[in-house]
């Protein structure tokens, strides 16, 4: 079986250029749009597998990608075990990192540029999603996320994130 990914790679710069052009031509985000993103992020934290929320998730992801007002900087080093594509809920977790980070920045505009705070906000959303997923799918456990839950319960999540994001380039 062949993969289509190598053929798609040359088109990625064009896609990013088009997204950047669309973002620049857009005006500032409305307060209603911002609040909608926050509401969607929090709904998904509680019910990440609710299929009725999937269109909302897609809208919010697109909004975050195209909106120049809320610029997120995710450190994927915080989610190491999710790089393997076999993890069934990988997309839900990664999408939530993006949406929870955006929601954090919308709720805390004074933290724009604070990569640590932004990523901790994203990870806290991820841990809520992961907890909800594991509750209905006990076999969905991932060691790295279990360890982060344990760090969060001991008040060590910020310290862990601070050390981990040193390896990320923002």
Regions found by a protein language model. Give the residues of each.
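Basic/polar N-terminal segments that are highly enriched at the extreme N-terminus
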Residues: 1-2, 22-25
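Bacterial N-terminal signal peptides that target proteins for export
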Residues: 2-12
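Bacterial N-terminal signal peptides
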Residues: 10-20
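A generic alpha-helix preference that emphasizes hydrophobic side chains
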Residues: 20-21, 95
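Immediate post-signal-peptide N-terminus of mature secreted/exported proteins
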Residues: 24-62
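Mature extracellular/secreted ectodomains of secretory-pathway proteins
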Residues: 52-164
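Domain-length accessory/inserted modules outside core catalytic folds
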Residues: 165-170
């Amino acid at each position: 079986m062949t993969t289509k990914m190598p053929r798609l790679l040359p088109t990625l710069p064009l896609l990013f250029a088009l997204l950047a052009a669309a973002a620049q031509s857009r005006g500032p985000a409305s307060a209603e749009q911002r609040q909608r993103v926050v509401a969607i992020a929090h709904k998904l934290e509680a019910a990440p597998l609710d299929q009725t929320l999937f269109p909302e998730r897609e809208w919010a992801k697109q909004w975050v990608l195209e909106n120049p007002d809320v610029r997120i900087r995710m450190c994927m080093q915080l989610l190491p075990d999710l790089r393997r594509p076999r993890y069934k809920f990988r997309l839900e977790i990664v999408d939530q990192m993006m949406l929870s980070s955006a929601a954090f920045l919308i709720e805390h505009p004074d933290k724009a540029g604070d990569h640590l705070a932004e990523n901790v906000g994203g990870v806290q959303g991820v841990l809520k999603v992961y907890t909800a997923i594991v509750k209905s799918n006990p076999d969905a456990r991932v060691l790295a996320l279990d360890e982060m839950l344990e760090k969060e319960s001991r008040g060590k999540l910020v310290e862990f994130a601070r050390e981990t994001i040193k390896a990320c380039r923002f």
